Amino acid sequence: FAHRRATVKRVLDDLEREGAEFVVGLTHQEIGEDEALAREFGDRIDWIVGGHEHVAQFLRVGATTITKADADAKTAYRIDVRPTAGGERPAFTATAALVELDKSVELDSDMVRHVATSLVRLATAIEGKTGRKLLDVVATTEHLLEGTEPTIRGRETALGDLLCDILRDRFDLDLAFVNGGAIRVNDDVPAGGNLRVYELEGIFYYDDKPVIFELTGREILGLLEKSVSQATLGHGRFLQVAGLRFSYEVAPDGKTRVDAADVTVRPAGGTEFAPLELDRRYRAATLDYTWRNGYRDRDW
């Protein structure tokens, strides 16, 4: 935040010299970082329109209002700002209303054309790379595959199990894990539904690659504790796993804890789950983002 603080201060100084009367901060960062921004510059920023989280939020920090709408064009905040008379510095009243973007809302023609063009480009790229068309059916589901962010980032899901099982089985490993933030589909595939190339491409938007490595049982325990440390907030660090089972506790103060006694592992080739051995080395796989950086820049 130190680097951002200097940048924000410079921009605010410029805006005030140019005569700005109502300042809106357009951000894409976690809510805690927006709150820190409001606390630091609250007398100079009237409103923060934020992103990053994918669920609607509304809060006030001092004199600053922070709003975030739902992702995937489900909602939008309409913010009305009106000047009021009097005072040395121009004053304003500002209100916000969360609007559901349902079928009653007219589509923007420019955006419709943009989406159509993007889908054609995507379909062409997929067919050139895989030989499959975007709407080709790959499989039919027997069970519900939950891919919405509140589930994939907060608890075990069949979709997460499937993805990690594929990764683990493909390389004959002890375990595999994928962070919920890497699973981008944000939708469910119903039981008895068709799983198309479109859905498969929507699961992983990033160009992630699998990484195989070894880690100790003690390191596994540490990963699991970090995985659930913000599970109640729907953070992308929550891990979907294969080859191991675990449970965690949430204390009254919101802090989470994973006990080693609540972790079991089914090593490659095994049929039974056994207690986690803290000093044993296990072979595992994950995606290269988690391997290279994970969430170190976010207290990972």
Which residues are covered by each model-predicted region?
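Second-shell loop/turn segments in exported
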Residues: 1, 148-155, 208-211
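Flexible glycine/proline-enriched surface loops and loop-helix/loop-strand junctions
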Residues: 63, 144-151, 204-207
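A short C-terminal boundary segment appended to hydrolase-like catalytic domains
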Residues: 83-192, 253-255, 292-294
